[in-house]
């Protein structure tokens, strides 16, 4: 037993030793990989990358930047690369002592140092590339500025007539660029590449702006010397021709406005010669806006004339229609009021319309006289015609309503008479059905309702014979009688159906009288109620009695009665 325990302990010890050696082997692999990475890191061309700057002019800012980066290289190597070897050796020693955690810490520290070294290297690569690219960009801008400078100088010299008095200021501005180009060369030779970049970039913007001025100046001079004076002339003669055609354009004030615009235009060329192009453009824009305003006023007058010609025919027709309709209405009212009640306000409206129409006709005549003059302001004429058209339209609509009202009076009277005849016919039909039914007698309330309808009909018939008729009141009364008639018919139908249903229930229940005393007693009570015209109560008692001996039979009997 002891032997087995000793063997077990030995096995466990051997396994533990095996695990330790296995773990040490794995850690040694990590150390080897760390060593390999260190060798790769050492191959990074830190100094070679910095040597790219030696091809530049190592003075001034460039030299300062170069020295700073060179110092950074030394510090980076000493601080991040040199300690890596020591970390690796420490890890190996700890690993030999099976101190795995401490060894792993040393390996991790080594990788962190190499990560920082690589990061610093990449930062240096970016810095060097930025410096080289900035030098290239500076040279490209410089060459572009030189080309633009020469071209602008030739352009002003060759096309001096296009620039007018602005040619000399342009030449002076262009000549100012030469010392600025030389200043760039000085900054470049001194190695101040950042200052050189800022200087040449600003110069490039100045040249670009002046080039845009040179493109714009000939257009401004053309507009100032040719286009606008030509428009002034065209506008002046165009207005003169329109006045000959009969247009009143005094409100446009063409001559005075053009003279004022010519004065404003005279200030533009001096602005151009001083290269004050923004001010010149604002002045020209103001002149063009005022020209557009005059053109709009003139165009409005021309359109107004066309609209006047179109509107005159429409208003003439509308006025004739209004006048004819007014005469017709006055005649119809005098005729209709003998037979029908007419509101005095309607008659007064027609007389008022007559006065308004006459007034509008007078205004229209004055407008026509105005259009026959040698000079006409058609915009005012159009406004007046629009006023006339709106008012005539309102009058025609109101007069159409009145005419429809007069026609409706006759139609309403005929409709009321027709409804009254239908009421009388329907009333007699319903009453005959009551008399011919199985009722023991016609209930008194139906006799009363019939008499009320007869009285109402008699009164309305008397009103039909009176003149003038108040159609609205008559129509309302007939509508009331129709409602009474509908109530009379509905209630009569209910009574007739209930009477038949009650009779059917009693007849069917007779078969149970002999064997069921309570049924016999209930049916006797139902018969008594039936004779007294109390059909609903008779139905309730009969239904209750039959349902007690034959459930569901009352529903069947009721359906048969409804079908019949």
UniProtKB/Swiss-Prot annotation:
Residues 1-4 are extracellular. It is found in: Cell membrane. It is a single-pass membrane protein. Keywords: Cell cycle, Cell division, Cell membrane, Coiled coil, Membrane, Septation, Transmembrane, Transmembrane helix. Residues 24-564 are cytoplasmic. The chain crosses the membrane at residues 5-23. One of its GO terms (biological process) is division septum assembly. One of its GO terms (cellular component) is plasma membrane. Residues 84-126, 165-223, 271-303, 350-435 form a coiled coil. Belongs to the EzrA family. Negative regulator of FtsZ ring formation; modulates the frequency and position of FtsZ ring formation. Inhibits FtsZ ring formation at polar sites. Interacts either with FtsZ or with one of its binding partners to promote depolymerization. This is Septation ring formation regulator EzrA. It comes from Staphylococcus epidermidis (strain ATCC 35984 / DSM 28319 / BCRC 17069 / CCUG 31568 / BM 3577 / RP62A). The lineage of its organism: Bacteria, Bacillati, Bacillota, Bacilli, Bacillales. The gene is ezrA.
